């Protein structure tokens, strides 16, 4: 279906709580697919936006809870089914070279009915009923081929939330399934005002390190370091915000401070002179007191730095 037509129904989708994946974001996700897949699968395919950025000759598979959205998909080589991906998997037993997904964030699900399901049985814990995020990740992992790659857009909370989700996240890390975590700040793409993240999954990885990415900055982090951080996968844990620090010339800074003090003193003297004239008293005793203080520091043997803008002497103040 043409992008223009999708744009026209975006507001209707948003009113129903359906998240629309912009074309630019779909392209971003596909950029992390570093293999030549024979097929691509989206377990929550919506109107097919993520699948639409792949080669038209590639076999495409998708499942969507909303049958109305599924009917909008007009892609070549596409096979799709309507139904609940978690409770009614339409592609049981199938594996795919490439999986792209933007599952609904933190929706409810019923883990009690699926505890013995082949997709979830190997994990030591199931995600809580109130948050199905990691359930979708387990579903995706099950359907991923041994040499395949999965790229999933998720809510950042799954990177650090604890309890059951923390156990599942630890299992993913220890089994070396997580290849890369990418931070996507809010408003980076149209219709994505909240911050999100991209999680890249692979099986049979050659390294146990995880790559963290934030804009132009990347950091390769060992599994041991992640374990030391209680398996927290927040990008900000491993890539600190860079603050540009201006190089400071301490001598010049001190010189400027002395010159500023002199200018301030001159203005204070002007003010005191005006007050004394208004009150009909002499300012001379005040000037004499200042001279007395200056004589304590007016040592001819003392040299000033060559970088000084001007040498501050007793004469400067006497000119006031």
Residue ranges and their predicted role:
Residues 63-64, 98, 126-130, 228, ...:
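Hydrophobic alpha-helical scaffolding
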Residues 190-253:
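Flexible, glycine-/basic-rich loop-and-beta segments that form/coincide
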Residues 234, 238-317:
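Basic, amphipathic N-terminal segments
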Residues 104-135, 157:
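Mobile active-site "lid"/loop adjacent to the S-adenosyl-L-methionine
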Residues 1-10:
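Long recognition/docking surfaces used for binding and targeting
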């Amino acid at each position: 279906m043409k992008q223009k037509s999708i744009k026209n129904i975006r507001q209707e989708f948003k009113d129903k709580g359906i998240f629309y994946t912009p074309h630019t974001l779909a392209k971003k996700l596909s950029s992390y697919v570093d293999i030549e897949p024979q097929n691509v699968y989206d377990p929550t395919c919506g109107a097919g936006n993520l699948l639409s950025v792949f080669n038209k000759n590639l076999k495409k598979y998708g499942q969507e809870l909303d049958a109305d959205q599924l009917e909008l998909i007009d892609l070549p080589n596409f096979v799709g089914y309507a139904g609940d991906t978690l409770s009614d998997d339409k592609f049981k037993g199938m594996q795919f070279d490439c999986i792209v997904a933007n599952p609904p964030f933190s929706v409810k699900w019923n883990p009690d009915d699926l505890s013995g399901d082949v997709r979830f049985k190997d994990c030591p814990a199931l995600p809580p009923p109130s948050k199905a995020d990691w359930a979708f990740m387990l579903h995706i992992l099950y359907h991923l081929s041994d040499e395949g790659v999965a790229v999933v857009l998720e809510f950042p909370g799954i990177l650090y939330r604890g309890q059951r989700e923390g156990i599942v996240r630890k299992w993913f890390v220890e089994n070396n399934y997580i290849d890369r975590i990418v931070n996507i700040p809010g408003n980076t793409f149209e219709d994505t005002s909240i911050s999100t993240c991209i999680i890249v999954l692979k099986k049979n990885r050659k390294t146990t390190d995880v790559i963290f990415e934030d804009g132009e900055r990347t950091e390769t982090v060992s599994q041991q370091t992640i374990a030391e951080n209680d398996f927290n996968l927040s990008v900000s844990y491993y890539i600190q915000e860079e603050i540009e620090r201006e190089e400071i010339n301490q001598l010049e800074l001190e010189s400027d401070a002395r010159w500023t003090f002199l200018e301030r003193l001159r203005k204070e003297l002007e003010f005191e002179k005006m007050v004394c004239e208004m009150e009909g008293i002499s300012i001379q005793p005040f000037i004499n007191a200042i001279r007395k203080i200056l004589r304590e520091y007016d040592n001819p043997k003392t040299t000033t730095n060559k970088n000084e803008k001007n040498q501050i002497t007793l004469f400067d103040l006497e000119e006031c």
